[in-house]
């Protein structure tokens, strides 16, 4: 079974990219959907690729989806690496695009992408050896790692109306995905993504995009994330509804999320020693937090990979 890996990547420090962003959506604010942390690049991809070389060398090809950019350190002559520009897979009316949620709806358009593939953000890392069986079951269907934390309607209503804690943009677009699948299949999946390296069948993404073409069409002109977007968890929910995937709930020993502005979580990381971990930037992180995160990654993955010049 050939298994590829797809990353989304942006260098938010690039003046040319910044000018394009500012002309389209204005300068970044501290609002979550358009904050500096959303586009910050501190070299995380380099360390993620080092973790791939260390723990998942069996991956066939690595596609890096970008907006007319590529990391200066990237060895593009490596036969495993292919840089894909947004305009190769997205419609003209979506460009330029600063909305990762929308970009993720076009992964099946990547030329040469295998049927079985993994998707990762550049802040995801592997911490232990993994095999294809970590991501795909013996029947070839993806293992869908989700968070058991309550995401059902009552829990969301209670949060909104009793606790007075409105849903974040991220949770809103996941809820949109769950409610859309419920509308068509009659089942509401009360689980949500958990910052994993996720597995997919390309055919399921194509099937879902065709099935929900009308519902997805309002997203097309959304250059930045919007509250009525539909998160890519919709592909996992459809896979479950169509019996094209296997649901597994995660624990901190499987996947651990480090908020780089919370240094106490580094101690928790050592306690759990997870298979996967995420170094999550945010609107609350500062340059000192990002330096500490890179120092941590350098200690975990000090060896230069074949993907670097």
What do the PLM-derived regions correspond to, one by one?
Residues 57-60, 108, 112, 125, ...:
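Hydrophobic/aromatic-lined pockets within catalytic cores
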Residues 142-221, 226:
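Long, charge-rich alpha-helical interaction segments
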Residues 211-309:
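C-terminal catalytic/acceptor-binding lobe
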């Amino acid at each position: 079974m050939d298994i590829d890996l797809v990353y989304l990547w942006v260098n938010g420090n690039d003046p040319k990219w910044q000018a394009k962003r500012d002309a389209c959506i204005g300068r970044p604010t501290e609002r979550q959907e358009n904050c500096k942390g959303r586009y910050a690049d501190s070299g995380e991809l380099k360390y993620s690729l080092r973790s791939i070389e260390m723990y998942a060398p069996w991956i066939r090809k690595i596609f890096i989806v970008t907006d007319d950019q590529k990391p200066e350190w990237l060895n593009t002559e490596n036969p495993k690496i292919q840089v894909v520009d947004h305009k190769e897979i997205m419609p003209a009316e979506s460009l330029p695009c600063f909305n990762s949620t929308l970009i993720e709806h076009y992964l099946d358009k990547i030329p040469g992408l295998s049927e079985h593939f993994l998707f990762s953000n550049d802040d995801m890392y592997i911490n232990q050896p993994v095999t294809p069986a970590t991501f795909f079951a013996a029947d070839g269907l993806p293992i869908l790692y989700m968070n058991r934390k309550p995401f059902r309607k009552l829990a969301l209503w209670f949060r909104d109306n009793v606790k007075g804690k409105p849903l974040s943009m991220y949770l809103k677009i996941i809820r949109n995905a769950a409610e859309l699948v419920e509308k068509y299949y009659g089942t509401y999946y009360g689980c949500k993504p958990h910052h994993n390296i996720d597995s997919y069948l390309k055919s399921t993404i194509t099937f879902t995009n065709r099935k929900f073409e009308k519902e997805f069409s309002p997203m097309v002109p959304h250059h930045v994330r919007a509250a009525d977007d539909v998160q890519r968890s919709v592909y996992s929910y459809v896979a479950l509804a169509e019996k094209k995937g296997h649901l597994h709930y995660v624990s901190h020993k499987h996947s651990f999320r480090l908020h780089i502005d919370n240094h106490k979580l580094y101690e928790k990381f050592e306690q759990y020693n997870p298979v996967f971990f995420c170094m999550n930037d945010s609107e609350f992180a500062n340059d000192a937090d990002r330096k500490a995160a890179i120092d941590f990654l350098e200690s975990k993955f000090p060896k230069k990979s074949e993907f670097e010049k």
